[in-house]
């Protein structure tokens, strides 16, 4: 019985984490129109949870997204889609345009859009610029 309670608590904690991530995603998602398709762009969701959160977003009728793109600090984009949209083609072409590779499956794919060090440099520039503006210390 003790082991059952332990797994029940783990399941509850996991479901709470997913619910919190879904709420976060709905707050930070940005709309992007791509050739008449509604894309949702999200920054800050760990790769381990992207497929689960994408499914929740893509099949939520109130949100009505056809593609979800997850941007991350490593300079990569992960795409998820529903219906007839082949995001592997998008990832492949986007990766080629920016000089990196990309691809995957019809409904789940990804590509690199910039180097990790380049992304870090840009983030540090934004951080430094912002810190210099507040003049607290």
Go through each PLM region and give its residues.
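Hydrophobic helix-and-loop "lid/oligomerization" segment in the mid-to-C-terminal part
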Residues: 1-99, 104-137
């Amino acid at each position: 019985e003790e082991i059952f309670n332990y797994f029940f608590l783990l399941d509850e904690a996991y479901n709470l984490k997913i619910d919190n991530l879904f709420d976060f995603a709905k707050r930070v998602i940005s709309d992007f129109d791509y050739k008449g398709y509604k894309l949702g762009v999200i920054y800050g969701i760990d790769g381990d949870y992207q497929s689960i959160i994408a499914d929740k977003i893509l099949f939520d009728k109130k949100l009505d997204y056809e593609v979800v793109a997850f941007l991350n600090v490593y300079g990569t984009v992960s795409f998820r889609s529903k219906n007839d949209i082949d995001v592997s083609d998008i990832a492949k072409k986007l990766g080629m345009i920016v000089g990196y590779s990309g691809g995957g499956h019809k409904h789940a794919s990804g590509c690199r859009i910039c180097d990790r060090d380049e992304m870090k440099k840009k983030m540090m520039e934004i951080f430094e610029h912002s810190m210099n503006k507040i003049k607290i210390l």
